[in-house]
């Protein structure tokens, strides 16, 4: 590995080694090679371009659509002793001119810009006059029409790079890209002989679960009662749901805030800051919240409603556990969610695309919704479902998700599955799920008589079953490939590959489980989730809390989020290593030279004070009674 890169990592960021995938990306950039890196949230994508940016001559331009992310990244870089700036609509024209003037004079190594800035005359003139060694495209999936967040302004990046006096290295980063989106990024950005680094989509510290539950409000209250001190995000699909849940929790005394586009800018900013600065542990929000939020200590993300795509879910759920600590991602599912999401898709604005593209995009969106519904209904491993969607190979159940830990009842539904096939064959693939299920149940509906399905052989064939059972069976048969739903606005049910069902040895086994609603009378049990703090003794945890208190004090003084001072993980390492001088403090993971100069003495004094007050305290589980490792 490049020695200078390792030294830069240690000096500025306080880490001894690169994480998985980072080293390969950094080396490729330093070899003047274009790069596309697909790395999960929390994998340290920013270090992949920040380290080479500090080593290479000239300036690195980082293109990001997220104002809040730019501001947080620049704050974090400045804290690490790195001169960086951002240029976006939050600055006045005079502030922008000053930033460009200082950059032209060599003050800044890294400049974050919004993609719209690439069409600005003043910025283009600046870009032609300075040495730009690298253009970094963050959230690179935004350049793909098949990505979940396509932004037309990203297409301008190609012309911007082309018109520079000398072609810089182009590096692109994203956390969410299917094979189709990956190829689109490579092609659209015109990457030359790129190194493609895919570290995988598996966030091993995240525990995924789906709860098919009626009383969602009770579940949320019960969950918060069991995690009272933890930071969490609760996503809702509509503003109305956000407001209703906020009012309910607020009235019950929960320290909670909210975020959606219906609130004015000032209120949104205040509520977001209250959450980021740890003043309010829980935020309820629409998906307008979170893009670019780098808060590392979010311990849980609850989806009150089903998101519209796996890409959205992976990205939103991925805001939990960015610090590597074990965290939970809970999706509360009901059939009503599908109806709401379908309504939101039907009302989507297509005024800026032609008719052919509208048809293709609608098909894509409906297919994504069906895949998301499949995730909510699968009885298989949830982690594998996510990984396989993104094209990753899996090797057996993960044993770290809700489905892997559930007790299922297995029922042979082969006879019923064959009747479903017969019914769909009789409809000749013309009708949707509701008609097929109604026919099989023998429902007395005027619509069925009107369509003539009451004359089918399959009419009433499964009248000894419930609608819920048949929905679950059809969902499982769809997952197995025996059936599929079309991707039109009004999707219909059609036959897939049914040849295995002709074999008498083939059985369709349906797995079911009993959903348990929260018991209001039962006292909440504390979470048993494993954390890094489990490595600390009671005394060690007391020191950790003292260091957190000091961190919050410093964060208020510096007007920045606490995690930018030091992450929880760094504070835990301080408790375990218990440094007594600056040299030992530099051995703590996440303590670089600049942060040592700024904050080292205050943290050393806090540790020394604690040790003087409790001289015989054993701080970590790895120590024996004499305090030896």
Can you name each region flagged by the protein language model?
Residues 2-5, 340, 353-355, 364-366, ...:
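Accessory DNA-binding and partner-docking regions appended to nucleic-acid-acting proteins
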Residues 3-12, 16, 20, 24-46, ...:
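Helicase motor core with emphasis on the C-terminal RecA-like subdomain
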Residues 28, 303, 375, 573-574:
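Short alpha-helical segment immediately N-terminal to, or the first helix within
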Residues 68:
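Conserved Rossmann-like nucleotide-cofactor binding loop
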Residues 91, 173-177, 212, 360-364, ...:
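Catalytic cores of large soluble enzymes that bind and process phosphate-bearing ligands
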Residues 360-390:
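Short, charged low-complexity linear segments at domain edges
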């Amino acid at each position: 590995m490049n020695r200078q890169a390792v030294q830069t990592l240690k000096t500025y960021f306080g880490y001894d080694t690169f994480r998985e995938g980072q080293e390969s990306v950094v080396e490729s950039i330093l070899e003047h090679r274009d790069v596309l890196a697909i790395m999960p949230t929390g994998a340290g994508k920013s270090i992949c371009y920040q380290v080479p940016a500090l080593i290479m001559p000239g300036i690195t331009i980082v293109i990001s659509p997220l104002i809040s992310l730019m501001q947080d990244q620049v704050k974090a870089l400045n804290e690490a002793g790195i001169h960086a700036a951002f240029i976006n609509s939050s600055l006045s024209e005079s502030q922008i001119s000053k930033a460009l003037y200082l950059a032209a004079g060599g003050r800044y190594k890294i400049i974050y810009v919004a993609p719209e800035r690439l069409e600005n005359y003043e910025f283009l003139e600046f870009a032609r006059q300075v040495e730009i060694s690298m253009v970094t495209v963050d959230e690179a999936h935004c350049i793909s029409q098949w990505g979940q967040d396509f932004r037309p302004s990203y297409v301008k990046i190609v012309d911007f790079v082309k018109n520079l006096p000398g072609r810089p290295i182009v590096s692109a980063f994203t956390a969410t890209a299917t094979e189709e989106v990956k190829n689109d990024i490579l092609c659209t950005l015109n990457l030359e002989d790129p190194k493609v680094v895919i570290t995988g989509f598996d966030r091993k510290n995240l525990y995924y679960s789906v709860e098919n539950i009626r009383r969602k409000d009770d579940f949320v209250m019960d969950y918060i009662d069991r995690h009272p001190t933890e930071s969490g995000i609760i996503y809702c699909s509509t503003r109305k749901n956000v407001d209703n849940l906020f009012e309910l929790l607020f009235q019950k005394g929960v320290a909670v805030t909210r975020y959606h586009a219906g609130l004015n800018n000032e209120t949104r900013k205040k509520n977001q800051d209250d959450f980021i600065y740890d003043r309010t542990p829980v935020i309820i929000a629409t998906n307008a919240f979170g893009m670019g939020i780098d808060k590392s200590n979010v311990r849980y993300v609850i989806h009150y409603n089903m998101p519209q795509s796996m890409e959205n879910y992976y990205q939103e759920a991925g805001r939990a556990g960015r610090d590597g600590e074990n965290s939970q991602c809970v999706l509360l599912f009901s059939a009503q969610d599908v109806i709401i999401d379908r309504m939101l898709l039907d009302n989507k604005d297509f005024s800026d695309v032609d008719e052919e593209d509208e048809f293709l995009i609608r098909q894509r969106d409906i297919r994504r919704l069906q895949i998301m519904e499949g995730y909510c209904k699968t009885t298989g491993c949830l982690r594998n479902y996510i990984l396989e969607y993104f094209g990753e190979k899996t090797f057996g159940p993960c044993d770290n998700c809700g489905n892997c830990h559930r007790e299922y009842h297995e029922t042979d539904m082969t006879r019923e599955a064959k009747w479903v096939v017969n019914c769909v064959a009789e409809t000749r693939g013309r009708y949707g799920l509701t008609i097929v299920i109604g026919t099989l149940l023998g429902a007395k509906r005027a619509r069925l008589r009107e369509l003539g399905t009451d004359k089918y052989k399959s009419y009433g064939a499964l009248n000894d079953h419930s609608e819920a059972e048949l929905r679950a069976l059809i969902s499982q048969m769809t997952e197995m490939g025996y059936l599929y739903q079309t991707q039109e606005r009004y999707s219909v049910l059609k036959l897939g590959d049914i040849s295995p069902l002709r074999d008498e040895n083939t059985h369709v086994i349906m797995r079911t489980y009993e959903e348990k609603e929260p018991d209001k009378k039962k006292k909440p049990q504390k979470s048993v989730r494993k954390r890094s703090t489990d490595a600390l003794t009671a005394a060690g945890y007391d020191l950790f809390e003292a260091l957190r208190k000091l961190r919050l004090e410093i964060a208020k003084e510096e007007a920045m989020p606490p995690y930018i001072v030091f992450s929880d993980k760094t504070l835990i390492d301080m408790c375990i290593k218990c440094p007594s001088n600056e040299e030992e403090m530099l051995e703590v993971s996440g303590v670089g030279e600049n942060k040592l100069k700024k904050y080292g003495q205050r943290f050393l004094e806090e540790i020394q004070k604690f040790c003087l007050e409790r001289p015989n305290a054993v701080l970590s589980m790895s120590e024996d009674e004499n305090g030896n490792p």
